[in-house]
Amino acid sequence: MVEAVADIGLIGLAVMGQNLILNMNDHGFVVCAYNRTTSKVDDFLANEAKGTNVVGAHSVEELCAKLKRPRKVMLLVKAGSAVDAFIDQLLPHLEEGDIIIDGGNSHFPDSIRRTKELEAKGILFVGSGVSGGEEGARYGPSLMPGGNSKAWEHIQPIFQAIAAKAPDGASCCEWVGETGAGHYVKMVHNGIEYGDMQLITEVYQILHEGLGLSHDEMADIFEEWNKGDLDSFLIEITRDILRFKDTDGQPLVTKIRDTAGQKGTGKWTAIDSLDRGIPVTLIGEAVYSRCLSSLKDERVRASKILQGPSSSKFTGDKKTFIAQLGQALYAAKIVSYAQGYMLMRQAAKDYEWKLNNAGIALMWRGGCIIRSVFLGKIRDAYTKNPELENLLFDDFFKDATAKAQDAWRNVTAQAVLMGIPTPALSTALNFYDGLRHEILPANLLQAQRDYFGAHTYELLHTPGKWVHTNWTGRGGNVSASTYDA
């Protein structure tokens, strides 16, 4: 009879899986490793895991037999059908109360489905976002578990031990919420990551193309910013990238083809925001900017055909403008996170999740790509008011955007005058202005829809009552009501 010695099993021995196993081992947990290609198990035990307490299994049945009850199995395999296939293989060897954890990059609807399907079979399912890449997996990732809450007490000691630690020592892992909440929050995290990166690249282009600064000069600016409110992993690595020289002494970044790739998680966030009717405009623009960058050949042709401003030279005080750039970047970053939290708030309503908003900010403070000092302020805002309607309504963020407002407007205006694209900086400001307007021109839009399609409209003094006007004789005839604008 096989002895149950392992605290947790892990399926999937790519680098992420191996590193998570070694991380768990470092924290005193016995892990049983399994891979579909069983030779990988032997190679791992003979090399990376040599001298550790890691044990191996050559079948799913052996894996489950080596696990202490309640059994805990973590999957780090390709999202999609592979996850379902392994779940099907595991089920005959599990019993009521056992736990399956999907730590891959699954889309949240799949996690919702799996939680419900497995609950009906007595199995506790957890869909957990894992952020931080290979190094994070080895030395401390940001973990975002959600699903069947009964599983949390059993996996909490492992997850909070192996997770990254924030500067104050807090573990970057908390229970997120029900069903697909863990993978949903990870999706929004990735969308915000898209937004943060796009904002930084726009500032980079303004500094380089607009102000004519060298890469070393720009690196100095990012280094200075990293000592203040903008202190973050992405600002830090941007500094390092700008300083990095190729073998010929030239900045390597200038030789990299300007076509950005994407794996689709930013697109997931943008599409989800459209489905929910939440204006997550900054992340959307970040996705579209990557799409535009991929049209390299067309942009090369356009650069020789399309006319820009008559004069694109900056004539102001550079030192003052650089300080304003930092303020604009900070304000736009606030909007990006406000939009992300708006989206999570709506999803929580739609799925009846009780999201741990302060805990989410805490989870993102270490071990992940968007980690920053800034997140501590978000945690404070939601700790003070767990039902906060909008991050911009918190006193700290309300004052911060107000303080940055003049600089923010000047930066976007100067970029327009210089012909430098700033889709993320600009859309953040446009969102801010739209949100603070009690009256928007959608009244005219509704009248147009009613004119050509009889879609009806509400009056200000009678909301909820829908009326239609026959506009004939006051600008034209009513068209057929088959239009859907």
Curated annotation (Swiss-Prot):
Keywords, sorted A to Z: Gluconate utilization, NADP, Oxidoreductase, Pentose shunt
Xref: InterPro entries: 6-PGluconate_DH-like_C_sf, 6PGD_dom2, 6PGDH_C, 6PGDH_Gnd/GntZ, 6PGDH_NADP-bd, 6PGdom_BS, NAD(P)-bd_dom_sf, Pgluconate_DH
Residues the record marks as active site: 186, 193
GO biological process, one term: D-gluconate metabolic process
GO MF terms held by the record: NADP binding; phosphogluconate dehydrogenase (decarboxylating) activity
Annotated residues for binding of substrate: 105, 131-133, 189-190, 194, 263, 290, 449, 455
EC number(s) per entry: 1.1.1.44
Reactions it catalyzes: 6-phospho-D-gluconate + NADP(+) = D-ribulose 5-phosphate + CO2 + NADPH
Broad EC category: oxidoreductase
Residues annotated as binding NADP(+): 12-17, 35-37, 77-79, 105
Pathway: Carbohydrate degradation; pentose phosphate pathway; D-ribulose 5-phosphate from D-glucose 6-phosphate (oxidative stage): step 3/3
Highest taxon of source: Eukaryota
SMART domains, per database record: 6PGD (SM01350)
Role noted for this protein: Catalyzes the oxidative decarboxylation of 6-phosphogluconate to ribulose 5-phosphate and CO(2), with concomitant reduction of NADP to NADPH.
PANTHER family: 6-PHOSPHOGLUCONATE DEHYDROGENASE
Family of the protein in this entry: Belongs to the 6-phosphogluconate dehydrogenase family.
Subunit structure: Homodimer.
Name this polypeptide is given: 6-phosphogluconate dehydrogenase, decarboxylating
Gene: 6-PGD
